[in-house]
């Protein structure tokens, strides 16, 4: 039988062992994540937006064919891409996306955005107010149906402040896709971050996206990682990317390893600038 002093010493040794194990596990994850980010060859940063025109970009607005910039939804003004509703009377479900011309596989993307302080259209749904996003790993605009509201993609969601309720920017959403977070398939269409700010409209925010060759993805807001996930696959059971079922079923639940980048128009004016990309390759 152990004496009381032996018992206390044994408990301390056990607690120390657990703490040490937890610390080593954490360090291993940190080192692994760092290694994943470091074990790539990075090309030069280059602009996707020239600051003057929409050359290289293709609009796709729901209910309209690819290439039609309906009511000049996407305009360039003083070095920014602006989502404008000046020509609209109502939104009428006409969500839009502005696609860059070529798909990408592994890269870092950075841009700056701000929601304008003037409100959206009167029939913009409550969830879509002060709401936009960066779509990536996306299908092409030409492969979308005319009525399709959202492309099959991953969305780096951008939110502005609405009312007094916390509304952190930087969620990840999955129209037509699945992802895993900490090895578990995300159940909700959108997963909000736990450490991102609620940003008042009119404030410029820096958004950064990293898509590694091994399929790991990180999202940053103002330099802080707000999401890390992996394993992008198509979701045959999706109900969000309306009209995309044939596109998804033709490909099965396959892993998504590349795709297009698009900027979203979802019912509220927003501006984007300094859109740049750095392509990555495995060593």
Question: Across the structure, where does each feature detected by a protein language model lie?
Answer:
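Short, low-complexity, intrinsically disordered N-terminal modules
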Residues: 5-8, 29, 33
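N-terminal secretory signal peptides that target proteins for export/translocation
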Residues: 1-16
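Carbohydrate-interacting regions of secretory-pathway proteins
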Residues: 35-283
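Bacterial N-terminal signal peptides
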Residues: 17-30
